[in-house]
């Protein structure tokens, strides 16, 4: 056990002025703190007052991240006290701004920075990390950060923010989480010229050297932390994201949140929307604006969900259309990747999205291309003309990249549109006086619960069925009252309960399918998983002190 000033410098141990007098004396920190004793609730109040005093979301982000560096328990106590308020600060949309200014906001290193020049030595670098038990890693190479593109080493803000939500929303213990940046350079000329840039100052290394780095990283991580260590890939460029997922998914315990997590939350929204449209998913025609990893991930999970309804895979694929930067994806068109070719149909080539919407007449329109304003007034009005209750998801992040706003959607569909977005939007009051609360299809509904479930049962590999199961659980947690208010997702205040239910369901299916590795199987799975959840309450550091009977303590001469 640390003592003295080291206790106050360790965010895992530090309680600030919540240390009792006895703790201060026993830990040799008496006199290193003001002669004041504050409870955790008073400390939360102090942080909230400072938070409210700030006017910039970036400054609020820095305030909270500084707190995480000082007092971990208090940081998570603050986050969980009002998750709906703080999630947009520690994650989307503010984390995107924080990544763009990461050099300016950088205070204290958090996570592991591994570069292309460290090949052959990654195992040694992992030994430098102070924690010997790591259950979850979020790793990025910074090439496709949200909808902002290549931010290189500045992308470290994403794994840090993601893992904060692993704990705040899922209860995964923070000391068992490790954010990792794989720095192979950046093609962002602005960053290469930025005097505050904290990463390697050269163009991205690609090809065999890049693949060798990834292979070594995966082998080193599992050698150090075990084959059941969860490795989440985050914000890799499209080409690498699919390739690496296919390469590693059956060898390691891994998933890609941009492909599979986004798919799960989008399908959850669609399943909830079906309770409004009163039909089946396989009755719908889906059009995607975008054909990257998010779109393809959603499309593949929709196919799986339609198959579960009894439709063949071929029939399900016929109901899905995609538009990329070159237009409608059709058979015979040039520049189609194998993943896109999967959803190419016999149709003439078309480029304009408004014309495509008029021609295809989709019942579901999903935007994941990070093109702000792509869903024009004409498109929204056409969707309302084709459908009694059009389903329109503007899932691109951050807010500036959203295909349309909630207000535009409700206005141009005359309040009939069923809406979900990737970033938060304020409630909208219709001319009728009804107030609608746009559903935010945030991946944070998915990955914390998935992580908790996977870690709790020691799941060996994470298949797409896990994400369809997760989508079903999320949709089931949406009440009729939520739907009447325009919400396609459970209120964020319930996200910890939702994550727990996801974890329990994943673990149950893992034990049923013999894919779990934590044995013996707990008799009460929910109670077992609850026992694994992180507590934000302070630990007591007073030594266990007691006395013996006086006769037993007599000194014999």
Curated annotation (Swiss-Prot):
This entry's comment on the bound cofactor is:
Divalent metal cations. Prefers magnesium or manganese.
Where along the sequence does the record put site: Important for activity? Answer: 258
Mind listing the GO molecular function terms for this protein? malate dehydrogenase (decarboxylating) (NADP+) activity; metal ion binding; NAD binding; oxaloacetate decarboxylase activity
Tell me the GO BP annotations in alphabetical order. Answer: malate metabolic process
Question: Does the record's keyword annotation contain Repeat?
Answer: no
Which Pfam families does the protein's record reference?
A: malic (PF00390), Malic_M (PF03949)
- Active site, renumbered: 91, 162
Cofactors, names only = Mg(2+); Mn(2+)
| Outcome of substituting residue 194 to N | No effect on Km for manganese. Increases Km for malate 8-fold
Q: Where does substrate bind?
A: 144, 162, 443
**Location in or out of the cell:** Cytoplasm
Q: Which UniProt keywords apply?
A: Cytoplasm, Manganese, Metal-binding, NADP, Oxidoreductase
What is known about its subunit structure?
Homotetramer.
Name of the protein in question: NADP-dependent malic enzyme
Q: Which organism is it from?
A: Columba livia (Rock dove)
Query: What is the name of the gene encoding this protein?
Result: ME1
């Amino acid at each position: 056990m640390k003592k003295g000033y080291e206790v106050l410098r360790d965010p895992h141990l530090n309680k600030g002025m919540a240390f009792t007098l006895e703790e201060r004396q026993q830990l040799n920190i008496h006199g290193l703190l003001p002669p004041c004793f504050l409870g955790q609730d008073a400390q939360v109040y102090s942080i909230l007052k400072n938070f409210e005093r700030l006017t910039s979301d970036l400054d609020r982000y820095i305030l909270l991240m500084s707190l995480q560096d000082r007092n971990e328990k208090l940081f998570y106590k603050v986050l969980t006290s009002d998750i709906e308020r703080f999630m947009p600060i520690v994650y989307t949309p503010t984390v995107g701004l924080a990544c763009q200014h990461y050099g300016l906001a950088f205070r204290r290193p958090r996570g592991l920075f591994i570069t292309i020049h460290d090949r052959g030595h990654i195992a040694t670098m992992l030994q430098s990390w102070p924690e010997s038990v790591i259950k979850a890693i979020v790793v990025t190479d910074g090439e496709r950060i949200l909808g902002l593109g290549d931010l290189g080493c500045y992308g470290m803000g994403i794994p840090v923010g993601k893992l904060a939500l692993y704990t705040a929303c899922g209860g995964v213990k923070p000391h068992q989480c490790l954010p990792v940046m794989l720095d192979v350079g950046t093609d962002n000329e602005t960053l290469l010229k930025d005097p505050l840039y904290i990463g390697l100052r050269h163009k991205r290394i690609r090809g065999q050297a890049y693949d060798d780095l990834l292979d070594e990283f995966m082998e080193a991580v599992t050698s150090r932390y075990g084959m059941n260590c969860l490795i989440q890939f985050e914000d890799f460029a499209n080409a690498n994201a699919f390739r690496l997922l296919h390469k590693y998914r059956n060898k390691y315990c891994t998933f890609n949140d941009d492909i599979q997590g986004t798919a799960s939350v989008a399908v959850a929204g669609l399943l909830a929307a079906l309770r409004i449209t009163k039909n089946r998913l396989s009755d719908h025609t889906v059009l995607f604006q975008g054909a990257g990893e998010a779109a393809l991930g959603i499309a593949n999970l929709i196919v799986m969900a339609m198959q579960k309804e009894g439709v063949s895979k071929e029939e399900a694929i016929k109901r899905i259309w995609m538009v990329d930067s070159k237009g409608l994806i059709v058979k015979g068109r040039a520049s189609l990747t194998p993943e896109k070719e999967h959803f190419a149909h016999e149709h003439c080539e078309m480029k304009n999205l408004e014309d495509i919407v008029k021609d295809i007449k989709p019942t579901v329109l999903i935007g994941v291309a990070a093109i702000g304003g792509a869903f024009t007034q004409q498109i929204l009005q056409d969707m309302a003309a084709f459908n009694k209750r059009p389903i329109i998801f503007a899932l691109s992040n951050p807010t500036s990249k959203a295909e349309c706003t909630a207000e535009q959607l409700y206005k141009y569909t005359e309040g009939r549109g069923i809406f979900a977005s990737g970033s938060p939007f304020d409630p909208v009051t219709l001319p009728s006086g009804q107030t609608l609360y746009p559903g935010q299809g945030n991946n944070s509904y998915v990955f914390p619960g998935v992580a908790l479930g996977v870690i709790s049962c020691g799941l060996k590999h994470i298949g797409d069925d896990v994400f369809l199961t997760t989508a079903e659980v999320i949709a089931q947690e949406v009440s009729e009252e939520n739907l009447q208010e325009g919400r396609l997702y459970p209120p964020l205040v319930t996200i910890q309960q939702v994550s727990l239910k996801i974890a329990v369901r994943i673990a149950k299916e893992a034990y049923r399918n013999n894919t779990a590795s934590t044995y013996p199987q707990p008799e009460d799975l929910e109670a077992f998983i609850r026992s694994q959840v992180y507590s934000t309450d302070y630990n007591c550091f007073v030594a266990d002190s007691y006395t013996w009977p006086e006769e037993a303590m007599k000194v014999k001469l």
